[in-house]
Amino acid sequence: MTHIISHEHLSLGRLKEIIENHEKVELGPEAVAAIEKCRKYLDSKMEDIGRPVYGVTTGFGSLCNVTIPADQLSQLQHNLVMSHACGTGETVRPQIVRLMLLLKAQSLSYGHSGAQLITVQRLLDMFNNDILPVVYQQGSLGASGDLAPLAHLSLPLIGLGEVLYKGKVRPSKEVWDEMGWEPISLQSKEGLALLNGTQFMSAHAIWSLIQCHRLSEWADRIGAMSLEAYDGRVEPFLPLTHQLRPHKGQIDTATRFMTLLDGSELIRNHKEHVQDPYSFRCIPQVHGAVKDSIRYVESVIENEINSATDNPNVFPDEDMIISAGNFHGEPIAIPMDALAIAMSELANISERRIYRLISGQRGLPKFLVATPGLNSGFMIPQYTAASIVSQNKGLCWPASVDSIPSSQGQEDHVSMGSNAATKLVRVIDNCEEVLAIELFNAAQALDFRHQIAGNKSSEAIEGIFSDYRKVVPFISDDVYMHPLIQKSIEFIR
């Protein structure tokens, strides 16, 4: 299947399909016409332009008052890409780099950036052939666009930098020769069009949202298993209470739990306790708030990826070139910080349920092992979960509240959205690990609950339990736990 880039709305769901199904991507007629029209207009303006145009006939940042001669405009753009490729730190994971390529091509396709058709096409050639530029996590302030990471993304276009191809990192020029591609001679404004933009932040956000939806679903499944294993009550999930406080996420979570628990024998057993701890009783409110946060951030990010986010903006029909600030990452930096907080809470409440399951309450043995003392059982997985959620709390300090002036004060307020983006990914990875540890504990506890109660949970929960037991066994005596935690993580991926 091939996805055609057009001016139609590109959704998170569609992006997920493109990435997971390894679909090819092509420019549609609408996009081609818009790109060529804008480039033709910009070329014509270069012939008789009577005033300086930022980034087109001038230097960049605080060098905006330096006028560049017409015969050096191409060199200006070439120099920009080379000089701005200053990233450091770990490399960006390949899935996110693929998204960066696609989102950059999408943004340039609206015909307000001035890119050549061959430039946009080459971005898609890299995407379609899984030739991924080596991009580094550190270097962007999330304001003048994601300058450093997008420079690394763009280096291969001019035959420089490195790419990941068929599992190996190689000089892009080598791969270009194999593909029969020539380095592109960037024209006026093109380097700036490539580097100005929020595609580093947006790609991280898109990848994160895909994972957030998956983990939110797993949190409900695992939470329901923990509820059954802990001999929890069903009343907090009944619809009447949630009609009094109709947050969509809360209602959706309660409804989901009632579906997961439908037909359970365990949930109908007589309960001596009147109510459950908050980590069980308030699952609809907490998991629901996370769902609402995901939904809100998704709406913001979808708006962002369907936008032109470089500078200046070119308007051929209006005969205008406007220098403005669509590259500023604040609109997505704040939501990404908020999403990190939401996912951290999903891990926080999960860790509390882990703690309850190993505490020797409601008939369950201490640390979920038949002979505690000789065996430590599930004592230390909770330590691991506690360590992870503690780290998340530090990672959730908002990046977007910080700003450091740059470029001799010309760029005096920045979003730090790139830091929000990379921190968000770490929080999500951590959340996945905590949920996997909860599943590890919940399945062990459910085995004991089966023995204690003599009956079973619902078909849905028992199905998950049965599938999980095919990869992670019941633990009778102490064993090497790390591989089992890793298998648990892989199970929910």
Question: Predicted segments — roles?
Answer:
Residues N65-I68, V81-G89, L101, A105-L108, ...:
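Generic short alpha-helical segment signal, independent of protein family or function
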Residues V135-S140, D317, I321:
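Cysteine-centered functional microenvironments
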Residues H7-L99, I118, D125, L209, ...:
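Generic N-terminal targeting/processing segments that precede catalytic cores or assembly contacts
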Residues G111-Q138:
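FAD-binding glycine-rich core of flavoenzymes that anchor FAD
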Residues T91, G111-Q116, E217, N306:
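Alpha/propeptide regions of enzymes that mature by internal proteolysis
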Residues T2-E23, L27-A34, C38-Y41, M46-I49, ...:
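C-terminal auxiliary extensions adjacent to catalytic cores
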Residues Y54-I68, Q72-L76, S83-L108, Y136-I158, ...:
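FAD-binding core of FAD-dependent oxidoreductases
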